[in-house]
A protein has these predicted regions:
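Short, well-ordered beta-strand elements
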Residues: 109-112, 188, 196-212
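N-terminal targeting sequences that direct proteins away from the cytosol to non-cytosolic compartments
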Residues: 17-98, 150, 176-180, 203-248
Length: 248
């Protein structure tokens, strides 16, 4: 090979390597920015930061549309699903009272529980929930969908068991005054974390009447799945006794 040709090849190789070495970090940074942007867009219906409940037993990003329940005569009725009055490890509930065209208000409610596995395994939690739900006239034959896989964003549980309940169910349809409990077509999803290595079993229940569900940023199923993906693991040292659930 002529010296001139060899020199040209060497120069081209150096230029190509230099260009590749220069652009590769930029491309990686760009791809990471795109991934971060897409992730932020997916979780846009949730608050930016997680909220801790039950003295740190569970932490997750709440749906931003929800807020602490208003204190009135119907609060204790609304914060728990009517078919799970004994809610395992109850720690908190958040709600949104949505005004309908006739000025009636209907609640969308997220109920949160945290059960240390040293006290009760997730399979026992599920049995306790299912036994109660099947007593409701709308759901006598429902059963768990087991092994719903999600991609956790904070190292939390990747496996959940899900109870999907669509049909007439009780809602407080007049939460600004005397409670008026009526059966409305609605949807409730109950998610129980089923990670075999978890130290705390997280229980999430999201309910919405069909008449106001379209005012949520995404569907009930999508919203509770997003929240479940943000559940953060809890150290055993932080686990304490669960809070008492509201009175029946």
């Amino acid at each position: 090979m002529h010296r001139t040709a060899a020199l040209s090849i060497a120069i081209l190789t150096a230029v190509s390597c230099g260009s590749g070495c220069t652009t590769r970090p930029y491309e990686q940074d760009y791809q990471q920015r795109v991934a971060d942007f897409r992730g932020a867009a997916v979780f846009a219906p949730l608050a930016q930061d997680p909220t801790e409940f039950g003295n740190g037993r569970v932490a997750l990003r709440l749906p931003s549309v929800l807020e602490p329940p208003k204190e009135d005569d119907g609060t204790k009725i609304r914060v728990l699903p009517p078919f799970v009055r004994q809610f395992p490890g109850f720690v908190a509930a958040y709600e949104k009272l949505i005004v309908m065209s006739n000025n009636m208000q209907l609640p969308v409610v997220l109920t949160i529980g945290a059960v240390p596995v040293a006290e009760q395994r997730f399979s026992e939690v599920e049995s306790a929930i299912l036994e109660q739900v099947r007593r409701d006239e709308s759901f006598p034959k429902v059963d768990w969908e087991r092994g719903r896989s999600v991609e956790p964003m904070a190292g939390g549980p990747a496996m959940w068991d899900v109870l999907s309940l669509s049909g007439p169910q009780e809602f407080d349809s007049k939460p600004t005054g005397e409670p008026e409990i009526k059966r409305w077509p609605g949807r409730c999803e109950i998610w129980v974390s089923a990670d075999p290595k978890q130290e705390v079993c997280t229980v999430l229940a999201l309910r919405a009447p069909d008449d106001v569900a379209d005012q949520l940023p995404v569907t009930v199923t999508e919203l509770i799945e997003l929240a479940a993906r943000t559940v953060q693991p809890v150290a055993a040292a932080a686990v304490e006794q669960p809070a008492d659930a509201p009175a029946k």
